[in-house]
Amino acid sequence: MAPTRHWVTPLLLLCCSGICGAIQWLGLTVNGSRVAWNESEHCRLLDGLVPDQSQLCKRNLELMQSVVNAAKQTKLTCQMTLSDMRWNCSSVENAPSFTPDLSKGTRESAFVYALASATLSHTIARACASGELPTCSCGATPAEVPGTGFRWGGCGDNLHYGLNMGSAFVDAPMKSSKSAGTQATKIMNLHNNAVGRQVLMDSLETKCKCHGVSGSCSVKTCWKGLQDLPHIANELKSKYLGATKVIHRQTGTRRQLVPRELDIRPVRESELVYLVSSPDYCTKNPKLGSYGTQDRLCNKTSVGSDSCNLMCCGRGYNAYTETIVERCQCKYHWCCYVMCKKCERTVERYVCK
């Protein structure tokens, strides 16, 4: 497998300063986990926060552990969701510095911005419901009349609070008059942040718990809860694959983003947008932020993006065998444990040349 941590040159990192400043907070995973977040001085000293976010940090110290958790989840979820793609989000580990794949207004940066925005609001909403934050609690009881056989109760995710605090944090750099970066890039990033939050809102669903004799479920207590991050990330992956390339154009009295190929219509609020086309990520090219796919695992029988033909860009692949140990022949013993044997199995793996 290609490593997920890479050395990058200072020149490449400098190009990020204004454009991807709004996702530098993903770098809080490096040292933010070791901070107690009980002193406002921490907000200024740690890498990853631009000035406007530092001010929000000082006013909302109790939220910062959730921000750190969201940064971890964004990195993990991004890499898991795109593990079958040539661009597999490995460069996000360089945060708070980034290579051009995340600093040039690309399709990939659109996905990461949207995912980070959704993840932060999701994390805060869940933290409210679990009692981790002193400034919020369960979500409000739904206004809609409950259906037959259930009643509103439990503790729903506080989506309203999560959206308010999350958007204030991730949008702050683009809304600041002092921030660097082009106006087109700021509009793009704000748009993609909003798309991420909309997918999060669309994931809100009714969840229920049964009550009754012997699990008869004669009565159900229900609440509104968010779906898990993998579901939200997969929705955003679909939008990533169908993202629209845009240009910054004068329309009427103001400039706005319009589709490059279909500039007769405005950008839809539901679609991810990008300004700069990406390379194919087949070969290593640090100047483009491409790590290449050499030594990446591929699937010989797949016809999707993880197939050896697509992943290896026609270069071919090498095969090797690997022995794995797994649990097998498991038996349940009364009461109350399961005993399993350990079995060895030989599997064939394929890596790109």
Swiss-Prot record:
Transcripts are expressed ubiquitously in early oocytes but become vegetally localized during mid-oogenesis then enriched on the dorsal side by the 8 to 16 cell stage. The protein becomes asymmetrically concentrated on the dorsal side by the 64-cell stage. During gastrulation, expressed in the lateral and ventral marginal zone, and during tadpole stages in the somites and first branchial arch. Weakly expressed in the pronephros from at least stage 12.5, with kidney expression increasing until stage 35. The keyword Amino-acid biosynthesis does not apply. GO terms for molecular function: cytokine activity; frizzled binding; growth factor binding; protein homodimerization activity; Wnt-protein binding. It is found in: Secreted, Extracellular space, Extracellular matrix. A lipid is attached at residue 214 (O-palmitoleoyl serine). One of its GO terms (biological process) is neuroendocrine cell differentiation. Glycosylation is required for protein secretion. Palmitoleoylation is required for efficient binding to frizzled receptors. Depalmitoleoylation leads to Wnt signaling pathway inhibition. Residues 1-22 form the signal peptide. It comes from the Eukaryota. The modification Sulfotyrosine is found at residues 274, 281. One of its GO terms (cellular component) is extracellular region. Glycans are attached at residues 31, 38, 88, 299. Induction: By t/xbra. By gata4 and gata6. Repressed by zbtb33/kaiso. Disulfide bonds join 78-89, 128-136, 138-155, 208-222, 210-217, 282-313, 298-308, 312-352, 328-343, 330-340, 335-336. Keywords: Developmental protein, Disulfide bond, Extracellular matrix, Gastrulation, Glycoprotein, Lipoprotein, Secreted, Signal, Sulfation, Wnt signaling pathway. Changing residue 274 to F: Loss of sulfation. No effect on secretion or homodimerization but severely reduces interaction with wnt5a and canonical Wnt signaling activity. Homodimer. Secreted homodimers form a complex with wnt5a homodimers; tyrosine sulfation of both wnt11 and wnt5a by tpst1 is required for this interaction. Interacts with the transmembrane receptor fzd7/fz7. Interacts with lrp6 and ryk. Interacts with tdgf1/frl1. Interacts weakly with frzb1 and strongly with frzb2/crescent. Interaction with frzb2/crescent antagonizes wnt11 function in the neuroectoderm, but enhances it in mesodermal tissue. Xenopus and other lower vertebrates contain duplicated wnt11 genes resulting from an ancient gene duplication event, but the second copy has since been lost in mammals. This gene was originally called wnt-11 but was renamed to wnt11b after the discovery of wnt11r (now called wnt11). Ligand for the frizzled7 transmembrane receptor. Primarily acts via non-canonical Wnt pathways mediated by either Ca(2+) and PKC, or by JNK and dvl2/dsh. Depending on the cellular context, can also signal via the canonical Wnt pathway mediated by beta-catenin and dvl2/dsh. May also inhibit canonical Wnt signaling. Maternally initiates dorsal/ventral axis formation by a canonical route, which signals via lrp6. In a complex with wnt5a, activates the canonical and non-canonical processes involved in axis formation. Belongs to the Wnt family. This is Protein Wnt-11b. It comes from Xenopus laevis. The gene is wnt11b.
